[in-house]
Amino acid sequence: MARILIVDDSRTSRKILRGILEGAGHEIVAEAVDGLDGVNKFKEFSPQVVTMDITMPIMDGLEALKNIREDDKDAKVIMVTAAGQQNKMIDAIKLGAAEFVTKPFEPDEITKMVGKLAES
């Protein structure tokens, strides 16, 4: 079981991720609605794994990832984004993202990623 922070501006996406991950036995410690909120909640809750959307208001996922990795070089962040954003995914990997997944994704795809990262 992993302690997870979900960062996504879409309420629907957060709800779907919560359902999938809780259904797999993981604990959602917090949800954040933008990158800045995500950085703050990362510091507050110290999750084992973060799922992070890339395109968000106030602070996008790439900037939030950069901030989180500056605070914790071992942070395990899975970037979640829409199809057609391959360049941003490459940027995310360069910034230290542990994994990435493209929407829509299969539930077992994200649960396997979270499980692998939680064990590492």
Language model: regions and residue ranges:
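Two-component/phosphorelay signaling modules centered on CheY-like receiver
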Residues: 11-30
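Acidic catalytic/metal-coordinating carboxylates
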Residues: 34-37, 60-63
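Active-site beta3 strand of CheY-like receiver
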Residues: 45-51
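Receiver (REC) domain active-site loop signature in two-component systems and cognate sites
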Residues: 56
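Short, conserved "switch-loop" micro-motifs in signal-transduction and mechanochemical regulators
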Residues: 83-84
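C-terminal output helix
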Residues: 105-114
